[in-house]
Amino acid sequence: KRVDKNGTPVTAKYTPTVTPVTPTAEDVESTGKQGQEQKQTPKFTEGDPVAPITISADNPAKFIDPETGEPTDATELPAMKDGKQVGTYTIDPATGKVTFIPNKDFVGTPDAITVQAKDANGTPATATYTPTVTPVTPTGEDKTTTGKQGQVQKETVKFTEGDSEVPMKIDADQPA
């Protein structure tokens, strides 16, 4: 409220409107071979340049704990499928990169893991990472021999790895 030289009062009102700045995130997926680790980094986008999302040691990316639905400081969580652990998720909090290490016998798609990052205002955004593990199936070649009773018969069966990136090991510790 103000008064002019003549003593006439005047009133004005100021009403600011605050618009929300909401960051966004993109879900990510990967596909890899059985027994091979997979990595992916969810992409976070600022809602406005005045509130950037800069993932760092001071503003770390975090997993959302699947049991509590809350952010956790844990950098390793079990990867689950139908209530069973099928591997492990790890996160680099300073970059947001998630690594999935499947159990050697797991094939399929585990439950996705959710990652959260916050912008400069502290507003969170979340994205999921969903890896898929494709099977690697080695093959064996049958062999047969014929001989008279009492005579020694020999033949070597042949095993072929399902993929060169997942070698088949046959030795004294892991015989055929």
Where are these regions (language model features)?
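Acidic, turn/loop-rich segments in luminal/extracellular domains of secretory-pathway
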Residues: 1-14, 71-129
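Extracellular interdomain linkers/hinges and stalk-like, low-complexity segments
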Residues: 4-56, 112, 120-174
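A surface/secretory-pathway sequence property marking extracellular, secreted
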Residues: 55-86, 172-176
